[in-house]
Amino acid sequence: MKRLFSLILFLGLAVNVFAQSDSLAFVNGPWLSERVDGLVMRRCQFEQGSLFASNQHIMVWELSDTDDFALQLAYRPERTKTSDMAKEQHAVAAVNGSFFDMGRHFPVLFLRIDGEDLGQTTQEETKLQSENYRFGTLAVTLDSVYILKTDTVSQWEAGLPYPNMMTARPLLIFEGEMLPLQEDLGFVNDRHNRTAVGIRADGTVLLIVVDGRAPKAAGMSLKELQQVMRWLGCRDALNLDGGGSTTFYADLRGNHGVLNYPSDNGRFDHEGERTVSNAVLVVRKAKKR
């Protein structure tokens, strides 16, 4: 029994050491940062298996200036590239949005834009929600962004007052608490390209993309993504659609087009962007006269 306890203690310490090692690797990685007005773009290529014993490519938008910029949700009834939705709305930045039906194109989780309900959570999606796999809702007004813990009551979002809402899954962090993630789901445990949104305690909004399915970018499990969101200082964090949908777009000084490595074409380049149903945009606010 004493030997067994010692082994368990050793394994626990080893896991903790590895977690500390990953957090240090993340913080001390070769991050490149560029500030444009109130928007910051960060990117990092982790090589030689330096993060989670794997190669990773991560990109982050940080939005802290709500005087000049605002978050905006976009939707098209026919699948459209995130970059094209961004261009149509003259967005300066964008990532892909929430989940959708690949064949019939419609959102499979609640979506409201400019007060109009455009998508309802399907019965199939509703069955997935549990105490260990909570849904979350990104709520957007002109001056504020919130991440809400979705109630299990069907179509709960429809009664909320926010003009723009996008439900996604799962909720990773809420009010500073790392939420449990259902361990028997491949979607949780397997590594994929990931897209997520987070909010820090000071109101800074983060849009995060993790590339995957390539030797230089392994992708992350949701538990790994959850750790990354915590290391980025998120008080609240929500996973969005990922895989081949994952896209990071820019139209700012010296940075134009898709900057990550979408995987739908099977190559590690910028040309594999998938058409999607919806997206999260960053737009410039109209100047007040």
What are these regions (language model features)?
Residues 73-79, 152-157, 210-214:
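Short, solvent-exposed aromatic-acidic interface loops
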